[in-house]
């Protein structure tokens, strides 16, 4: 009987070890998990690291929140969704398979991927943090405005920085062209105190009402907000432009933004616009757009 009791104890220890390891990982912020529903119909996927936390909506692969040391890095309006499928400001959104407007419908701006539900393809954790890959698959003829077979993968990795990778693969039998971009809404204390680096030849202040595309000058660029002592350092690869949007007081009412919201963020993100020549992919070819962000003082 005594050997049986020892075996039972060994089995209990084996069950306790994984649970203990899971608790350690959770306490260190090394695990990712799915959480409750959003205000829409999307499921939220959460990434955690020692320094921060990210929440991603599976609808549109949109980052709803990025917190570093307890502070929100992205601005999100009180009403996160625009009606009728229109573009919704806030967080970090994707523009695919076109950047800008195509057609006259409200839902035509920045492509249809932002309204699609992505599939959770994989999730990984490490001592440095965690990452998740979300996928969207299109069959030939599925979308009238983009009737090609393609797959889109979004990989988000959170360590001491946040990296977003957008990978487009031509899975069909004919070539196609597309454009894309990341649209972040960086929270600021005052848009009047923001300086941008690496966008033009020299540093410059954000201008009230600015909505402009600047040719890519290199991988690195930054946004410094003197009003809250924060600097966002970023790099981008696979883009032709950097898009700067500082609506300030010029556009007080814009889709899901309330009065005053336009003065609380700056948009600064990489894009590959059709105006500079869309990305052309032959069958089997892929293209990646990588956007890496780090928060400092």
Predicted regions span which residues?
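Bacterial N-terminal signal peptides
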Residues: 20-29
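Beta-strand-rich N-terminal accessory domains
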Residues: 33-91, 219-240, 248, 285-297
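Asparagine-centered strand-capping/turn motif at beta-strand->loop junctions
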Residues: 166-172
């Amino acid at each position: 009987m005594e050997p049986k009791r020892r075996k039972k104890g060994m089995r209990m220890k084996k069950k306790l070890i994984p649970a203990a390891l899971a608790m350690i990982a959770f306490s260190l912020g090394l695990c990712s998990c799915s959480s409750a529903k959003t205000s829409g119909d999307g499921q939220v996927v959460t990434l955690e690291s020692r320094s921060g936390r990210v929440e991603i909506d599976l609808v549109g692969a949109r980052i709803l929140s990025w917190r570093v040391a307890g502070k929100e890095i992205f601005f999100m309006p009180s009403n996160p969704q625009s009606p009728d499928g229109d573009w919704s400001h806030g967080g970090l959104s994707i523009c695919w398979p076109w950047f800008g407007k195509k057609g006259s419908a409200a839902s035509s701006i920045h492509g249809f991927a932002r309204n699609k539900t992505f599939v959770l393809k994989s999730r990984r954790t490490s001592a440095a943090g965690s990452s998740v890959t979300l996928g969207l698959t299109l069959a030939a003829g599925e979308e009238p405005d983009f009737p090609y077979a393609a797959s889109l993968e979004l990989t988000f990795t959170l360590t001491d920085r946040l990296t977003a990778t957008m990978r487009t693969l031509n899975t069909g039998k004919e070539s196609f062209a597309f454009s894309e971009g990341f649209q972040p809404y960086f929270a600021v204390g005052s848009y009047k105190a923001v300086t941008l680096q690496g966008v033009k030849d020299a540093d410059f202040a954000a201008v009230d009402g600015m909505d402009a595309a600047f040719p890519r000058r290199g991988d690195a660029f930054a946004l410094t907000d003197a009003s809250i002592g924060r600097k966002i350092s970023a790099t981008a690869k696979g883009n032709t432009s950097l898009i700067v949007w500082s609506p300030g007081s010029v556009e007080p009412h814009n889709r899901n933004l309330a009065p005053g919201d336009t003065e609380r963020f700056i948009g600064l993100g990489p894009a590959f616009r059709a105006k500079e020549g869309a990305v052309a992919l032959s069958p089997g070819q892929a293209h990646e757009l990588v956007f890496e962000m780090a928060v400092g003082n």
